[in-house]
Amino acid sequence: MSRRSMLLAWALPSLLRLGAAQETEDPACCSPIVPRNEWKALASECAQHLSLPLRYVVVSHTAGSSCNTPASCQQQARNVQHYHMKTLGWCDVGYNFLIGEDGLVYEGRGWNFTGAHSGHLWNPMSIGISFMGNYMDRVPTPQAIRAAQGLLACGVAQGALRSNYVLKGHRDVQRTLSPGNQLYHLIQNWPHYRSP
């Protein structure tokens, strides 16, 4: 084998790994989103589509149990959906996306369907992202924060959110303690947050 061939044989795998690493760091590449079928969601009965790209994102918390493993987060997503559909009589889980402390995003209604997270005024013009857990006295894990921020970057890259979208806390648009004192304080430092 010539010296040139040996050099290529050594360098090519490194260059391929470098290209793959750059590809995964592209903001158009979403944080992992757990699809509905993977967390065993009930079938949605929703039909009202959102008009994309959206100007607003509303961040809330479920105010219930937190989860930190894929298995516990899938169960928690099912619990939230069951409450929304079977107890409240909604067509699906109210949120467009749920964030677990396992660092994963769980698809709720997704980018295309109107949520039931912030009232009749805000639902048709916003995406609702809810952190699974209660964040009155603590912040979500760094993994959960990164997952949410990655989801927002993905929404912009895919054209679901405007590049100048405005982030709101649930309490900014409704009378509620959501997203909890600590999470609310945290999101106020995110670049797209705007006070009421």
UniProtKB/Swiss-Prot annotation:
Tissue specificity comment: Highly expressed in bone marrow. Weak expression found in kidney, liver, small intestine, spleen, thymus, peripheral leukocyte, lung, fetal spleen and neutrophils.
Self-association and partners: Homodimer; disulfide-linked. Interacts with HSPA1A; this interaction forms a cytotoxic complex that is released by lymphokine-activated killer cells. Interacts with HSPBP1; this interaction blocks the cytotoxic activity of the PGLYRP1-HSPA1A complex. Interacts with TNFRSF1A; this interaction is important for cell death induction. Interacts with S100A4; this complex acts as a chemoattractant that promotes lymphocyte movement. Interacts with TREM1.
Disulfide partners: 30-154, 46-91, 67-73
UniProt main location, coarse: secreted
Name of the featured protein: Peptidoglycan recognition protein 1
A GO cellular-component term linked to this record: tertiary granule lumen
Span of the signal peptide: 1-21
Alphabetically ordered keywords of this record: Antibiotic, Antimicrobial, Disulfide bond, Glycoprotein, Immunity, Innate immunity, Pyrrolidone carboxylic acid, Secreted, Signal
Lineage: Eukaryota, Metazoa, Chordata, Craniata, Vertebrata
InterPro entries: Amidase/PGRP_sf (IPR036505), Amidase_domain (IPR002502), Peptidoglycan_recognition (IPR017331), PGRP (IPR015510), PGRP_domain_met/bac (IPR006619)
Protein localization: Secreted; Cytoplasmic granule
Any single GO BP term: negative regulation of type II interferon production
Domain N-acetylmuramoyl-L-alanine amidase stretches: 53-180
Gene: PGLYRP1
Residues with the Pyrrolidone carboxylic acid modification: 22
CDD domains per record: PGRP (cd06583)
Role: Innate immunity protein that plays several important functions in antimicrobial and antitumor defense systems. Acts as a pattern receptor that binds to murein peptidoglycans (PGN) of Gram-positive bacteria and thus provides bactericidal activity. Forms an equimolar complex with heat shock protein HSPA1A and induces programmed cell death through apoptosis and necroptosis in tumor cell lines by activating the TNFR1 receptor on the target cell membrane. In addition, acts in complex with the Ca(2+)-binding protein S100A4 as a chemoattractant able to induce lymphocyte movement.
Keyword Membrane belongs to the record: no
